[in-house]
From Swiss-Prot:
Keyword rRNA processing: yes
Domain of life: Bacteria
Keywords assigned: Nucleotidyltransferase, RNA-binding, rRNA processing, Transferase, tRNA processing, tRNA-binding
GO biological process: rRNA catabolic process; rRNA processing; tRNA processing
Entry protein name: Ribonuclease PH
Record-linked InterPro entries: ExoRNase_PH_dom1, ExoRNase_PH_dom2, ExoRNase_PH_dom2_sf, PNPase/RNase_PH_dom_sf, Ribosomal_Su5_D2-typ_SF, RNase_PH, RNase_PH_bac-type, RNase_PH_CS
Function: Phosphorolytic 3'-5' exoribonuclease that plays an important role in tRNA 3'-end maturation. Removes nucleotide residues following the 3'-CCA terminus of tRNAs; can also add nucleotides to the ends of RNA molecules by using nucleoside diphosphates as substrates, but this may not be physiologically important. Probably plays a role in initiation of 16S rRNA degradation (leading to ribosome degradation) during starvation.
Amino acid sequence: MRPSGRTAQQVRPITLTRNFTAHAEGSVLVEFGNTKVICTASVEENVPRWLKGKGKGWVTAEYGMLPRATHTRNRREAASGKQGGRTMEIQRLIARSLRAAVDLEALGEQMITVDCDVIQADGGTRTASITGASVALADAINHMIATGKLKSNPMKGHVAAVSVGIYNGEAICDLEYLEDSAADTDMNVVMMEDGKMIEVQGTAEEAPFSHQELLDMLALAQQGINDIIEKQKAALAE
């Protein structure tokens, strides 16, 4: 039995609230249960120096957590003068995931930066960030089309992510903190809506997992991501 009473394949209640902030071209409050992340997509009419003159755009991301997003206060990374390794790993994952969903040549020499700020953490902050960032990115691109900065949509499709793991000997989907902290295996999966995988990150925390357990977790991830992408589509249709 899971702490929340969910079935093995059941994701948490997911909410995607668009236009959550006033100034960004795309903004979303994404909620996976008690995990809440604000994702804002900002458009700039320039690209990194190494891309100038190449006719391609760029999509990047930054990630951070409020000090009291967790049970006890964490010191702001800005106060220590540098980002932690976990933060850098997560924001690179978010950026890679979003770039996989965009035709950078069709974007032209423009850059979109997606900021993912965790305001409350209960497991799965990176997967929630990717899911919300995809919707914020879609809104930013639609804004670019509406304002004449793009002639066509460079997005190849929706991208979403979910965590899976082995908890109490069972493969489960979308782990909350109580499950994540006690899981034998923890894995994050990022997929496009056509089912193609962008990233699979998996680690045996307490005990090695079998090939069959890997297949079971990937099957749960695909089912969960299919459900999440339907929620993305519904949010963008509103």
